Swiss-Prot record:
This is Erythropoietin. Produced by kidney or liver of adult mammals and by liver of fetal or neonatal mammals. It comes from the Eukaryota. The lineage of its organism: Eukaryota, Metazoa, Chordata, Craniata, Vertebrata. GO terms for cellular component: cell surface; extracellular space. Its main location: secreted. Glycans are attached at residues 51, 65, 110. It comes from Ovis aries. One of its GO terms (biological process) is negative regulation of erythrocyte apoptotic process.
């Protein structure tokens, strides 16, 4: 195996090492998110965080409510949605979820006795959301999310609600990744393979 044969493998390995840091990876393959193992890794981290906070009472409640996206998916309606509308819903949900995780991180930092394990899960979620945002940009999802000027404003506003505990926030994070994000990336990757 020559040096040229190793270049793609080294770029892929480097991108996996830089993703947990939340750093943009310039040499990353643009369709890396189409590899199901990549998204599964983030889903697993979200589920671990959700499970770690399920039995947590002390230190897991927020002093204020945090706004999060509704993660329920009407599959019948989703399949009939325009690609731009799906992309817009995913981008809006990802942005709101990022704000919620950042707010949870700030509230946890200001807690009287913050648990180091909880802080680690929140930090991983922050890093994961940054990486997912970069991966979706590489997929071109951000371009699809921009509504066309002649498009009818039929897109419904993003449905939201509030949570008051870290366990609920991580449940929303996990559900969003397993639901809307997985549906959107799966379809976007299939469209790109045609």
């Amino acid at each position: 195996m020559g040096a040229r044969d190793c270049t793609p493998l080294l770029l892929l390995l480097l991108s996996f090492l830089l993703f947990p840091l939340g750093l943009p990876v310039l040499g990353a393959p643009p369709r890396l998110i189409c590899d199901s193992r990549v998204l599964e890794r983030y889903i697993l981290e979200a589920r671990e965080a959700e499970n770690a906070t399920m039995g947590c009472a002390e230190g897991c409640s927020f002093s204020e409510n945090i706004t999060v996206p509704d993660t329920k998916v009407n599959f019948y309606a989703w399949k009939r949605m325009e690609v731009q509308q799906q992309a817009l819903e995913v981008w809006q949900g990802l942005a709101l979820l990022s704000e919620a995780i950042f707010r949870g991180q700030a509230l946890l930092a200001n807690a009287s006795q913050p648990c180091e394990a909880l802080r680690l899960h929140v930090d991983k979620a922050v890093s994961g959301l940054r990486s997912l945002t970069s991966l979706l940009r590489a997929l071109g999802a951000q371009k699809e999310a921009i509504p066309l000027p002649d498009a009818t404003p039929s897109a419904a506003p993003l449905r939201i609600f509030t949570v008051d505990a870290l366990s609920k926030l991580f449940r929303i994070y996990s559900n969003f990744l397993r639901g809307k994000l997985t549906l959107y990336t799966g379809e976007a990757c299939r469209r790109g393979d045609r």
